[in-house]
């Protein structure tokens, strides 16, 4: 599930940088949960062709993340927000203030 979640985030953040065909295949495979055979049948191409294009698209998305780091930054912010919420729920203003300062520093 973690891999699917990670790929969904990569598609959300960087999907627009893929070609329209890559976007279509990644959407079908990861977000619509279609099999390689189903995608190949709909597109009139071989299963291997779909597999190869998906693998190239995945590599491109990972490369974009390595260079830009938007997903990493998003996850860090989400983690800090969770800490802030927990600190506020516990009434721990020192931890809450530290979390706010961390968010401001980003």
Regions found by a protein language model. Give the residues of each.
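Short amphipathic alpha-helical boundary/capping segments
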Residues: 9-18
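Short amphipathic alpha helix immediately N-terminal
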Residues: 20-32
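Hydrophobic positions on the alpha-helical face of helix-turn-helix-like DNA-binding modules
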Residues: 25, 39-40, 50
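Helix-turn-helix DNA-binding motif, specifically the short coil turn and the N-cap/start of the second
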Residues: 46-47
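Residues within the DNA-recognition helix of helix-turn-helix
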Residues: 53-56
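C-terminal flanking helix
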Residues: 58-65
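Short, basic, alpha-helical segments at the C-terminal edge of helix-turn-helix-like DNA-binding modules
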Residues: 67-79
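Helix-turn-helix/homeodomain-like alpha-helical modules used for DNA recognition
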Residues: 79-106
């Amino acid at each position: 599930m973690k891999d699917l979640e990670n790929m969904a985030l990569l598609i959300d953040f960087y999907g627009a940088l893929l070609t329209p065909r890559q976007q279509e295949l990644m959407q079908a495979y990861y977000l619509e949960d279609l099999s390689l055979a189903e995608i190949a049948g709909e597109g009139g191409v071989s299963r291997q062709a779909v597999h190869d294009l998906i693998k190239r698209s995945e590599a491109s998305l990972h490369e974009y993340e390595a260079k830009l780091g938007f997903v990493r930054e998003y996850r860090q912010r989400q983690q800090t927000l969770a800490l802030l919420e927990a600190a506020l729920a516990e009434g721990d203003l020192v931890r809450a203030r530290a979390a706010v300062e961390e968010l401001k520093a980003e």
